């Protein structure tokens, strides 16, 4: 009887060991819902299975708004309201939100002390998102020389990371001259195109970025924007370029509960499930940085 108990313990230990080894050899993949600007888009993305959200943010004189275009009637929710809704979803434990990617359109619009300043945005994220266990990725597209970038860089905490967009050599140079003090794991790059299949040099740039990541020069490498019909490109980038995930959804429209985003997400999930020996969808147990 004792030998049976010992055998059971050994088998359980081996099972746990095998699971641990598998987890360490599988790349966690992030499916990042594109242009999530309203509560209903959050609900749709999470119900579809997204494990991260991309939110465009524009500063107006009276605060920050989820807004891609910065036009008179282009804004969605306020940043505060959207963050609160996202955090509420996470608190329910029904969803897996690893991080929110804040694509900041005008980081230097306001000076410190105003509700439209970069400090005010960071304070909102720390007040609402981070206590819910949601990490924050600050995106600076062609604004690595901005005051906003420097503020985020100089006050970065362990829940936060920075992402710069462009060719790998350019990104490495920018991090070298402007990213002093940022831990490598919190240096993220992205490269892509609104029309993924038509993008120029997407594969070689992402492959080079992944190679630099594997050699300790970058933390994560993402691409964008995978849409319905980009199946082969998604497979190629995940398999051959070795990226960590994609922004998916519509190329130029807000996320919604329709077939387009669902199909784009399915491309990512289907690849991961078909390559479970090397890939898995990231969960709350995976620290992206």
Curated annotation (Swiss-Prot):
Question: Where is it localised?
Answer: Secreted
What are the positions of the active site? 34
In chain numbering, where does the motif SMD-tail fall?
282-289
State where Mg(2+) binds.
Answer: 54, 56, 103
Q: What is its main location?
A: secreted
GO BP terms in the entry: lipid catabolic process
> Which N-terminal residues, if any, form the signal peptide?
1-22
> InterPro entries, from UniProt?
PLC-like_Pdiesterase_TIM-brl, SMase_D/PLipase_D
Which GO CC terms are listed, alphabetically?
extracellular region
State if Nucleotide-binding is listed as a keyword: no
The record's CDD domains line, in alphabetical order, gives:
GDPD_like_SMaseD_PLD
For this protein, the record's Gene3D superfamilies field holds: Phosphatidylinositol (PI) phosphodiesterase
Q: Which UniProt keyword terms apply here?
A: Hydrolase, Lipid degradation, Lipid metabolism, Magnesium, Metal-binding, Secreted, Signal, Virulence
> Does Metal-binding appear among the keywords?
yes
UniProt-recorded Gene Ontology molecular function terms: metal ion binding; sphingomyelin phosphodiesterase D activity
Cofactor binding remark: Binds 1 Mg(2+) ion per subunit.
EC numbers on record:
3.1.4.41
Q: Which cofactor does it need?
A: Mg(2+)
The entry summarizes how activity is regulated as: Sphingomyelinase activity is reduced by 33 percent following addition of EDTA.
Q: Which SUPFAM superfamilies match?
A: PLC-like phosphodiesterases
Q: Which catalysed reactions does the entry list for this protein?
A: a sphingomyelin + H2O = an N-acylsphing-4-enine 1-phosphate + choline + H(+)
Quote the record's domain comment.
The SMD-tail motif is highly conserved and may be responsible for structural stabilization.
Family of this protein: Belongs to the sphingomyelinase D/phospholipase D family.
Q: Explain the purpose of this protein.
A: Catalyzes the hydrolysis of sphingomyelin. Sphingomyelinases D are produced by some spider in their venoms, but also by arthropods such as ticks, or pathogenic bacteria and fungi. They might play a role in pathogenicity through different mechanisms, such as membrane destabilization and host cell penetration, but also pulmonary inflammation and cutaneous lesions.
Write down what this protein is called.
Sphingomyelinase D
Organism this protein belongs to: Aspergillus flavus (strain ATCC 200026 / FGSC A1120 / IAM 13836 / NRRL 3357 / JCM 12722 / SRRC 167)
């Amino acid at each position: 009887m004792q030998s049976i108990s010992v055998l059971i313990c050994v088998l359980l230990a081996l099972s746990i060991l095998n699971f641990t080894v598998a987890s360490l050899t599988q790349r966690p993949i992030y499916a990042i819902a594109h242009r999530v600007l309203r509560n209903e888009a959050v609900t749709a993305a999470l119900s579809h299975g997204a494990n991260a959200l991309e939110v465009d943010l524009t500063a107006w004189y009276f605060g920050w708004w989820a807004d891609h275009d910065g036009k008179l009637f282009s804004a969605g929710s306020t940043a505060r309201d959207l963050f609160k809704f996202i955090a509420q979803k996470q608190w329910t434990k029904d969803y897996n939100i690893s991080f929110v990617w804040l694509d900041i359109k005008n980081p230097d619009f306001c000076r410190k002390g105003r509700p439209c300043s970069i400090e005010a945005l960071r304070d909102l994220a720390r007040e609402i998102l981070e206590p819910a266990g949601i990490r924050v990725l600050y995106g600076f597209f062609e604004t690595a020389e901005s005051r906003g970038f420097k503020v985020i860089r100089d006050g970065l905490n362990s829940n936060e990371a920075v992402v710069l967009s462009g060719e790998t050599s350019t990104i490495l140079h920018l991090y070298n001259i402007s990213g002093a003090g940022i831990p490598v794991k919190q240096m993220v790059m992205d490269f892509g195109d609104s029309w993924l299949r038509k993008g120029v040099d997407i594969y070689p740039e992402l492959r080079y970025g992944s190679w630099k990541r594997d050699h300790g020069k970058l933390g994560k490498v993402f691409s964008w924007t995978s849409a319905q019909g980009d199946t082969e490109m998604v497979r190629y980038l995940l398999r051959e370029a070795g990226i960590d995930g994609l922004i998916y959804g519509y190329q130029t429209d807000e996320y919604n509960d329709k077939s387009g985003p669902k199909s784009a997400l399915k491309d990512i999930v289907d690849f991961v499930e078909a390559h479970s020996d090397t890939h898995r969808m990231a969960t709350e147990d995976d620290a992206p940085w």
